[in-house]
Design a protein with these regions (language model features):
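Amphipathic alpha-helical assembly/interaction segments
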Residues: 1-127
Length: 127
């Protein structure tokens, strides 16, 4: 039974992604990227879970869905930052592919959650 956003499978998976990215940034990114790429990727990965949490607390399904869509955008933004990190040689191909797999899973789970919310929302009352 889902009582809180922390019970959602999509949140759990995206939280683990956020943790993995945080560790990666702290261990692999050079100091001169601290306020550049490192900051951007940390912000985008944090936005994924933050928007899932915020959407869950909204009273209306449509608002929750909108926050999930923002979260999905943050997933893709995070992937772009990871590709940039790969291009700059901060991470290797294996690290990029591992994180891309996690991002893809997060996207699938988000899409499933959005579809669930769409099916669950009450139909519009007819006038």
């Amino acid at each position: 039974m889902i009582k809180n956003f922390t019970d959602l499978e999509v949140y759990k998976e995206c939280r683990q992604l956020r943790i993995n990215i945080s560790i990666l940034v702290k261990t692999k990114f050079p100091l001169d990227e601290k306020y550049k790429l490192a900051d951007q990727i940390l912000r985008s990965s944090r936005s994924i879970t933050a928007n899932i949490a915020e959407g869950f607390s909204r009273y209306y399904y449509k608002e929750n869905i909108q926050f999930c869509r923002i979260s999905r955008g943050s997933l893709n933004e995070t992937l772009e930052h990871l590709i940039t990190a790969f291009d700059e040689k901060y991470i290797n191909d294996e690290e990029l592919m591992n994180l891309k797999t996690k991002i893809d899973l997060g996207g699938k789970l988000l899409n499933g959650y959005i579809n669930h919310l769409k099916k669950t929302q009450k139909p519009k009352e007819e006038d």
